[in-house]
Amino acid sequence: MTAQDTSAGSTVSSPGGAPADGLSAGADASPLDTVAPDSRRPSESTIRIGLVLPDVMGTYGDDGNSLVLRQRLRWRGHDAEIVRITLDDEVPDSCDIYTVGGGEDAAQKLAARHLSDSPGLQRAVSRGVPVLAICAGMQVFGEWFLASDGSRSRGLGLLDITTSPQASRSIGELVVEPQLAGLTQPLTGFENHMGATVLGADAAALGRVLHGVGNGVPADPSATPNAASTTAPGDSASTGASSTGSRIEGVVQGSIIATYMHGPVLARNPEFADLLLCRALGVDSLPPVDVPAVEQLRRERIATARR
């Protein structure tokens, strides 16, 4: 893939100030406007976004992350397309960036089995291709995850994490102070998960929770060997600390960024979307895109979380 370098230039105005980062009605935002994994790349410069298993890992609208990436590329003059990868497909290793969404227990098990049997995503990760994983997608990428019935499933081993149930489900607005270089603004999303994800030594947190729960605390810490990793680096708080300021959110390891934030998270956080695009394009920066509706959405969601 040879990317166009649009890292220099003035602010790009979105057509009509489209709301939610291009997720409004229109041909460019249609979730049906995708291509099959075995289709040919239209040109060498076309950016291919791999939408991984939306048939089972698309419960919470996380498919929208691929739409955001495509639209932000198109606004900057790049040709981009979404490659829809289902359970009926071999997973290609040729996409320039991948997104994986959330799902329930049965869907997670199907996803883990298929991605293990068809390891194109693993090959892409080994080459440093950027991947965004949401909620259950994050759990599948780990060493193992426990379902609500207590059964343990093996993950892909791409992230040094384990996931087991919390005492109660985490539902609500989530605001996170990012700890990843390149992110300077608070991250906002909506969490809806039963799992508590614990980081091992090779994984780092995406950020520190300001409002909400984040990665959570296992109901049975003894089932998770690294339970102390539920606190942010430098905190003295114990695993079960009540202060949300001591909690961490998400996982960063290699080229993978994972989070419990739905929304879709990239629609709410354009800086996050552009960080992923810079990695996919191999550039240091991109010209800003002015979407006033997104800034309004961010203000509203962050204010809601603080109430």
Predicted regions, residues:
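Conserved beta-strand scaffold positions in the cores of enzyme catalytic domains, especially
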Residues: 51, 82-84, 158, 189-191, ...
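Structural motif
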Residues: 97-101, 132, 260
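A glycine-centered loop/beta-turn motif at secondary-structure junctions
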Residues: 243-281
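N-terminal beta1-alpha1 cap of cysteine-dependent amidohydrolase-like domains
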Residues: 1-126, 162-164, 228-236, 267-307
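Pocket-forming structural segment of enzyme catalytic cores
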Residues: 149-250
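Cysteine-nucleophile active-site neighborhood
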Residues: 105-180, 184
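Glycine-rich beta-alpha junction loops
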Residues: 53-55, 194-196, 263-265
